[in-house]
Amino acid sequence: MRVPWRWLQEYVKVELPPEELAERLTMAGLEVTAIERFGIPGAPLEWDRERIVVGQILRVERHPNADRLLLATVDYGRGEPKVVVTGAPNLFPFLGRPLERPLKVAFALEGATLYDGHQPGWVKMTLQGRAIRGIYSDAMVCSEKELGISEDHEGIILLDPEAPVGMPLADYMGDVVLDIDLTPNLAHAFSIIGIAREVAALTGRRLRYPSTAVRALGPAVRRLVGIRIEDPQGCPRYSAMVIHGVQVGPSPYWMQWRLRLCGLRPINNIVDITNYVMLEWGQPLHAFDYDLSLIHISEPTRQ
């Protein structure tokens, strides 16, 4: 069970260092086998607080000398915006168009240490200014690979619109992850809230549950969808809810980041939210296409 520190803090305010909390959890029977850091001191790649910050793309223009390259003008909260050369495919939809929402990015300045996105494995490099097809560029909009988040180098990170321009990326999304080896008798702790409950008991801090209020509208679910359970003993209850007006697309980046920290790969907003709730509450969920109209629960395999 991988527990991101920032996520845990939303439910129980922990003032202990991660190592001390790990010791208390281990002595209570929840063995912490590893502590990982991302972007902060002690991480394999520390994100330089002065040189790796949140930026905002103001406009995207075509590179005058290369069809596959773009020029992105980026405000990074310090002085004049910088124009950088990028070939990020997920920026081409914004080419020459007014930006309908703030386009926030992870922005690295000259001298920053990053991973080389064009090299296999994890090879560090120092960002240096140079001319790219006749345009000088001394900064970079970063992919996940360059920041050591994942192997993904197909496009740059698009942060949430609320990300504060100029904030060090380490302050915005740097994190610590506790890797906890849970035994089958601790099923109550197989979730972020389950771990938060244990932490609250061990530290005497108050546990803050997230709101679960849901207002159901329209006809009863049983009039909209059917559920067939073949093995009532193995699965005595199966609950469903119908959600209309859903469009499949990418999840907000804060959710993608939390899923990655927990060891899951983001897929799309539908799959990601079911995985997110499972991690948060320990309740497995599955999303079905409403066109199926019948949810068929077969007999579980005995393994």
Predicted regions and their residues:
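Short, basic, glycine/proline-bearing loop/turn elements
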Residues: 78-80, 237-243, 298
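Phosphate-backbone binding interfaces of nucleic-acid-interacting proteins
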Residues: 1-219
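Residue-level detector of conserved catalytic or cofactor/ligand-binding positions
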Residues: 293-303
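Glycine-rich loop at the start of a catalytic domain that most often binds anionic cofactors/ligands
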Residues: 47-49, 125, 281-292
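Conserved phosphate/anionic-ligand binding catalytic regions in large, soluble enzymes, centered on
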Residues: 2-7, 187-201, 263-289
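TRNA-recognition modules of translation machinery and tRNA-sensing kinases, especially anticodon-binding
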Residues: 249-252, 256-270, 274-275, 298
